[in-house]
């Protein structure tokens, strides 16, 4: 019964946070105890969205462009040299 209640609680938290762009972080507890559940909202979700858009832009640039990195809101794509390997 405890497992079902715990599962339904996690399911409700995840579904309610999906519409608000929040993340649910589940931290495993010690053996035999329930895990901690934390709802995180902040710049990490904004940066994740930016990096997702970055990957899409690299793919749209043209055939052969690949995603390289996304750090500090800087999107980097690269075009591989002859031989198929990038820098």
UniProtKB/Swiss-Prot annotation:
GO biological process, alphabetically ordered = defense response to fungus; killing of cells of another organism
Taxonomically, the superkingdom here is Eukaryota
Identify the main location: secreted
Keyword Nucleus on entry: no
Q: Where is the signal peptide?
A: 1-19
Q: Which UniProt keywords apply?
A: Antimicrobial, Disulfide bond, Fungicide, Plant defense, Secreted, Signal
Q: Name one GO cellular component term.
A: extracellular region
Q: Where in the cell is it found?
A: Secreted
Report if keyword Disulfide bond is assigned.
Answer: yes
Cystine pairings recorded for this chain: 51-70, 54-75, 58-77
The entry sums up its family as follows: Belongs to the DEFL family.
The protein, known as:
Defensin-like protein 218
- Organism expressing this protein natively: Arabidopsis thaliana
């Amino acid at each position: 019964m405890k497992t079902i209640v715990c599962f339904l609680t996690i399911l409700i938290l995840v579904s309610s946070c999906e519409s608000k762009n929040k993340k649910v972080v589940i931290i495993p507890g010690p053996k035999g105890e329930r895990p901690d559940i934390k709802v995180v909202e902040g710049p990490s979700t904004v940066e994740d969205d930016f990096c997702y858009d970055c990957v899409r832009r690299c793919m749209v640039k043209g055939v052969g462009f690949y995603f390289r990195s996304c750090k500090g809101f800087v999107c980097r794509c690269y075009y591989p040299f002859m031989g198929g390997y990038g820098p």
